[in-house]
Amino acid sequence: MDKKKIFNWSITVALAGFLFGFDTVVISGANLPIKELWNTSPIFHGVFIMSMALWGTVLGSLFGSIPCDKIGRKNTLIWIGILFFISALGSAIAWDPYSFSFFRFIGGVGVGASTVASPTYISEISNKESRGRLVALYQFNIVFGILIAYFSNYLLQGFGGDIDWRYMLGIEAIPAIFYIIFVLKVPNSPRWLILYRGDTQKAKEILKQIYPETEISKRIAQIKSSADKKNSSIFSGLFNFQITLAFLIAFFNQLSGINFVLYYAPEILQSAGLAANDSLMSSVSIGFVNLLFTMFGLRLIDKYGRRYLMKIGSIGYIISLISIGFCFIYSLNSYVLLIFILIFIASHAIGQGTVIWVFISEIFPNSVRAKGQSLGTATHWVFAALITAITPYVINMLDNNPGMIFYFFGFMMILQLVFVLKMMPETKGISLEEMKFNS
């Protein structure tokens, strides 16, 4: 059992989350310059410029389980890095809104596929004692990527004059190259090797790094016992409860409004009265708080469990979202608004942000884990795309005052709290093969 190797493999694969976070938020700095450059309508800007990457994530998450099972988790992760590299360079040299949208779509496919491959891989090379915090490293890297993207946008503002947005987008190619190189050095998932390649010997060598020597034979037997089910349909009726859990946690994740805030943070803060430079710097503070409270979540998830963090996060969501709506409706000071936005971000980071990828990667058995991860993440990205596409239009209808939108998100988080209290099971301290649910 080699804890250092397990951590190194996990943090390497979790770097896909860094590219995910960077790619997701880097567009916030380019949003307004692109709108002015190509003079796009609110609907076109929302559906194509801001949401095209999200439509790519829908495709990547829907079909990400196919390469995960066919060519393996590791090889899928390598191709994900290549997609990020192509998207970064292509977006930077885009010559019109259509070419820009195409390359953003390519990056979105990489993001969507990474939300399937990375948590699946990490859950399969970790043990029950550390699985929560190791899978949550993916989320840590997402928020670290978000923070670096905000900071990068702030530093590059004015760097290239009217084309500074091209530098903001193109710089992502550098970490993409390093990610590809690092992933080449991690082993294949032992569970994938047994189930899809029948290579028990190679899997055994990897399992020795994960479990004590005395448990290896037992683990191999448990994994093999699910081999005859690897072609099972996820919709066979055997996994209805897991499907419902994955759908609801992903649905509520996006109905918190998190992507709306992250994508439109500078615009939201400017509409509340902050100057452009101040709003970008405030976005950096959002990224920092996100990172800090994700670190708290990493420390707590295997100690107190997934449900506990979701309860704390839900309560924080409700208080902060209703307060943000109040700030907009009654035109309160923009710095008061920023405080409640930071509380919202902290609530997300310690709750949904830390838990979602861990929980979905745990609840499905070996035979359909990648497919289940794909279903949960596809739900996440479909709603992310829909919300991001329609919010520019809705804000325009509300005379650029999004207060009622935040009231709506607050109501949805009341429903999430009910889901956590009444339906969500605890998965802390249970091995993947021992995870049982009543459908």
Per-region residue spans from a language model:
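Alpha-helical transmembrane bundle of multi-pass membrane proteins
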Residues: 1-199, 225-439
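Solenoid-repeat scaffolds in large eukaryotic assemblies
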Residues: 202-206
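Conserved H-loop
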Residues: 213, 217, 275
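Short, well-structured alpha-helical segments
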Residues: 216-225
